[in-house]
């Protein structure tokens, strides 16, 4: 068990018998009065956010999750099905995928995250390349400064088409690189 003062962003801990990932940590107090830690967390089983305040000496079990490389196979409403190298299939509920929904594409390789033997979510590669399926053309005269526009990118389920802010020179059918952690455009891979 670790005290709250040793827990870092990204650690997975047990809170009320539920696995929670720490998304943000704010420290308040002083050495005289004692420190408190305000954490923004997410329940890994239900994907619901939660905020709570803990004292520095509160203790938590740190959880180590298993991960396995998988390939996205298909969508069977409301489940997304992934397959590993041995052709085992893992079903993950839509709400547990979070922002990964925006980037999933048939045949995409990622890592399934397991808790207690059950696949609960996936981790995507940090950067991915996606084709722009729709983008407004650049407006003449609107090219000064760092002007951005929205571009819709391809993915497996059209209902989850996602937009990314891109520079004006990016056009429809371009393939762009995106950072999946921040949803930021990185560069054009292919015109």
UniProtKB/Swiss-Prot annotation:
GO terms for cellular component: cytoplasm. Keywords: Cytoplasm, Elongation factor, Protein biosynthesis. Coiled coil: none annotated. GO terms for molecular function: translation elongation factor activity. Transmembrane segments: none annotated. It is found in: Cytoplasm. Gene3D superfamilies: 2.30.30.30, Nucleic acid-binding proteins (2.40.50.140). Its main location: cytoplasm. One of its GO terms (biological process) is peptide biosynthetic process. InterPro entries: Elong-fact-P_C, NA-bd_OB-fold, Rib_uL2_dom2, Transl_elong_fac_P/YeiP, Transl_elong_KOW-like, Transl_elong_P/YeiP_cen, Transl_elongation_fac_P, Translation_prot_SH3-like_sf. Pathway: Protein biosynthesis; polypeptide chain elongation. Belongs to the elongation factor P family. Involved in peptide bond synthesis. Stimulates efficient translation and peptide-bond synthesis on native or reconstituted 70S ribosomes in vitro. Probably functions indirectly by altering the affinity of the ribosome for aminoacyl-tRNA, thus increasing their reactivity as acceptors for peptidyl transferase. HAMAP family: EF_P (MF_00141). This is Elongation factor P. It comes from Janthinobacterium sp. (strain Marseille) (Minibacterium massiliensis).
